[in-house]
Curated annotation (Swiss-Prot):
The keyword Transcription regulation does not apply. HAMAP family: GlcN6P_deamin (MF_01241). It comes from Bacillus pumilus (strain SAFR-032). Its EC number is 3.5.99.6. This is Glucosamine-6-phosphate deaminase.
Amino acid sequence: MNIIEFEDKEQLGKEAAALIARTIASKPDAVLGLATGGTPLDTYQELIHLYQSQQLSFKQTKTVNLDEYAGLDPDHENSYMTYMKRHLFDHIDLPQDQYFLPNGASPDLEKECLRYDQLIQDIGGIDLQLLGIGQNGHIGFNEPGTPFNSMTHVVQLDENTRQANARYFSSIDEVPTHAITMGIASILSSKKILLLASGKSKAKVIQYLEQTEIHPDFPASALKLHEDVTILIDREAGSLR
């Protein structure tokens, strides 16, 4: 793992966007794995800026997202599809038929998981996977104890994870209890992985990620099994290193 520290999250976001832009420049039809939450927002803003200043085009690119809430329609205000449209897709030239998320509203979620794995395989696999990290070491919605050989699957959300996401809903009761997530094996099958972490709340988990052994109780430790992982952090997230 290559860990690079920046002064603040804005610089971190610019560098993450630059890495993504270089991936697209070298392979215009690259498949990008994308993430949601607060951490990638600066990265997405910078990607929009690069597009608007005609330094970057997504016309040939395809994207797949890590996860989606179960039980929410894609057009629900708190779905990850809505998040991606609001923060990236609606502001760039990525064709609508070239971005993909799991369908959390599917009547058969298990079948949807299989469909999503097949989709990723059919479009050539992921060239660069963007990740955040939870305070318990979760990546995607892969909570502690998730097998490292897991592919896309339905997961019951940890209560701490639901609490962390409650700020996006009017109450904790509205936060879905389940989600579809790419599994740890799905993530590790990406050619390159780019993990972002910012803020003091991520300092302990970054310290632990560096020091811990590889173990399913800390899902992010699986990244040590991959040969091309870059971790970008800001000074606050690196304050306990």
